Amino acid sequence: ASDVYKRQMCAATAGQRGRRVLVLDHAEKPGKKILISGGGRCNFTNIGAAPDRFLSSNPHFARSALARYTAADFLALVNSYGIAWHEKTLGQLFCDGSARQIVAMLLEEGAKGAVEVRCGGNIRAVTHNDGAFSVDLGGKTVTAGALVIATGGPSIPKMGATGVAYDRARQFGLKVVEPRPAPVS
């Protein structure tokens, strides 16, 4: 479900900085993966997250990303919304109530930045010409000066998860590190 967190936090931050933001989600409702994570209570962060626990061909990326927005930062946001939580094993934090609280918080953060969320669509193609990205939604095209693709991998196909992010990365010449199973800590 971390792809949903990343997407929503990226969108909220950009929107709150005055950017016009549109989130396209192929799911019928946002946060579908969050709602099933942690048995419906959402394992929303891990206070033991550290750069050396990430598999990457660029270990400095994890260090830089985690220094800019830490698990403590996200926990402070959760606390500011009055969401009760508890720690399970190895620093895993879960909602006392429901994962719906985290989804609502993320959507509210986006709303503070006037982020528009469109659900139920399917991105057919993405192109880049003359400094702009065009996203074909099957009959409608959205154009933007910047594009962030934040998707999960193909881990839960029955939820609609696909490898589309890998295809898009390759399309734009980005190096792809093939995913592999990893234990959750």
Tell where the protein language model's regions lie, with residue ranges.
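Predominantly flavin-linked oxidoreductase catalytic cores and closely associated redox partners
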Residues: G110-S185
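Short beta-strand to alpha-helix junction loop
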Residues: A62-T70, T89-E108, P154-V164
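Glycine-rich FAD pyrophosphate-binding loop
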Residues: G15-G39
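Glycine-rich active-site loop/strand segments that organize a redox cofactor
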Residues: R41-T89
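Residue-level signal for inorganic ion chemistry
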Residues: V78, L106, A169
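Short, small-residue-biased leader/transition segments that mark boundaries at the very start
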Residues: A1-Y5
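An anion/pyrophosphate-binding glycine-rich loop and adjacent beta-alpha core
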Residues: E28-P30, L35-I36, F44-P51, A84, ...
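Conserved Rossmann-like nucleotide-cofactor binding loop
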Residues: K6-R7, K29
